[in-house]
Amino acid sequence: MALGSALVTSCLHLLWPARCAGCDTVLGSDDAVFCGGCAQATLPIGNACAGCALPHFGPPARLWCPGCVRLDFAFSRAFAAFEYGGPLADAIVRMKHGDRPEAARRLGRLLAEPLGRALAPSVGPPIDAILPVPLHPRKLRQRGFNQALELALVARGQAPALPLLSLPRLDRTLLRRVKDTRELGHAGPSSRRVAVFGAFAVADPARVRGKRFVLVDDVMTTGATFNECAEVLGRAGAEEVRVVALARALR
């Protein structure tokens, strides 16, 4: 049985070889996400601020950077895996705009580590549900998939913090996008806050009251989208919201 399964896997690899998410080079293993060169150029965030998720160089015990310590966030903690740039940025753009849902499922492996940190008991009480940041229905029809959902599906199954049976559920319908925001591209923080204001709504407040959530998205650019989602959940009675991104854009 094992031999047959290995043979099928080998045949599939020959017919449809795994390719690097960054440069599209054929990989030697289906388990890899990047080739060696792209993996080296994909930079982990490391020690980061709990508010903006940007790298900071203070002691690890210091959660907040000087710029965020006096700010009021709607979420309690932010986590990100990598700096947005280089091969990872190429992979994310290709995933979102090149009709590559399978790329989202592969990149989801890289989201498992920060999601595990967000779910860890040392961070706070247990999370009730993981929420992917939703797309507007029009954009979902155009793209064919929600990259945040695809990332979350994979990352949830591989998050190292908790055994599979005790993982929070993934709720894909609780948070809705009710305003079709334009592509924000290089928009600054204030423009992004204005663009996403009123863009999200809760489908059923009864499923929110007193609950704790983790929001998941592909890129955290300024934090405006995460903060707006967290505010909407907070107004509906959420006890806590943490946020997790695959990549964090550097200022």
Language-model features, listed with the residues they occupy:
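Glycine-rich phosphate/pyrophosphate-handling loop used in enzymes and phosphotransfer proteins
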Residues: 1-251
